[in-house]
Amino acid sequence: MSQILKQARTAAEQENWLEVCNYLRRLPLGKKENSTGELSELAIADAIELAIQVLHQGDFQQRWDVAKLLPKLGQGVVAPLLTILEDEQEDSEVRWFAGRTLGEYEDPAVVLSLVKLLQNPDTDEELATMAAQALGNLGTSAIEELSKLLLPKLAIDAPLVEEQTRLLAVQALAQIRRSEAIEPLLQVVGDRHPEIRTAAIEALSSFHDRRITLILIKALQDPAKAVRKEAAIGLSFRTADLAEFDLVNQIKPLLNDLSIEVCRQAAIALGRFGTDEAADALFRVLKSAATPLVLKIDLVRALAWAETTASLEYLQEGLRWSAPEVCRQIITLLGRVKSPTLKAKATQILIEFLYSGQNATFEATIKQAIATSLGQLGEPQAIEALEKLAGDSERVVKLHAIAALKKLSLSDRESSQPQEKTEKVSG
């Protein structure tokens, strides 16, 4: 062991930092601390000194490599890394690696140092972001200090600095994902800064707590569109609260929001809810002439995600009067129906549309989409329609129809094989 360290020190004297890293990697280091017992305290101290030298003088890759080794050298690395992190004259890249590594240690001194870095108005953005991420990695030990940063101060001279610090604190709490982070996050859902409210709502959405559902519902009416959007996203995953909090009726008004992004997220949420009431709300907006095309695409996607009899019937109705772009989307989505009980219905909808004589059905792209979707659904009732499309004058339609027929034929053969084997065995 002493030989490896001697070689590493010789390489350091020659400023060959790549070789120093290679020698340090050969030491019997544990996953986090020196758990092997093969290195003496003196040897560990030597290894730490060499690793810190690489951090100071190596290139980016060498710093990256040695930063992965440092946590394996135990608690002894904390003090020199804190010295680097707190030295404002030190190279910012070296400080970044030091702070990132310190995020592995649940040490009060580490928490305080990282918090001070966040509070310092002169800290550059990359260092501040790293500090927030490192604090997030530290978990519950960092929550108390981060909570203090959320308290509004009379920052008359530097309100933007205070806002940025508090925003980073919220983002750090969001990464912790522990129930202890809920209370401090609840304190800022009504913050005067929309960015902080948005970050808090996004963070709280990952927790299963009855209070949070009520907070998200209230946030649907926030004046900031980013907050409304995050609230809709959060509620879309709370299907367990669907009936108790009447979430469909809470989300429905957002389908007519002034922000198209909020409208689209509301559509996604209603699609995830998958109820007939949600499908009805989606369809009402879909058939409105005032609804933008981009939102109509999201509405039909949401109806398809619901995958219910009612939602498929609404999609069928949409085929009768929608623009070609929307029709193509509906046809494609019908081909992706997974429910065995609804595949036959989706197939029948496509066949009826093909024979409806609507203007859209004469477009090659529409016929091609129908052929592809019928092939994906794999229902025998589609054979006649596909044979018609296989005789189409457009080559691309013909090729897709033939491919779909082959897929149906293969599927039919595969499904009949188990039956044939059973008959042979019984015979």
What residue ranges belong to the model's regions?
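Short glycine/proline-enriched turn or capping motifs at secondary-structure junctions
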Residues: A390-I402
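Short inter-helical turns and helix N-cap capping residues of alpha-solenoid HEAT/ARM repeat scaffolds
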Residues: E13-N16, K32, G58-D59, E88-D91, ...
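Short amphipathic alpha-helical segments
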Residues: L18-R25, E49, A79
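Structural detector for internal amphipathic alpha-helices that build alpha-solenoid repeat scaffolds
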Residues: K6-T10, N22-L42, Q53, Q62-Q75, ...
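Amphipathic alpha-helical scaffolding segments comprising HEAT/armadillo-like alpha-solenoid repeats
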Residues: S2-K6, E41-H56, Q75-D87, D107-N120, ...
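Short helix-adjacent coil turns
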Residues: Q3, E15-E19
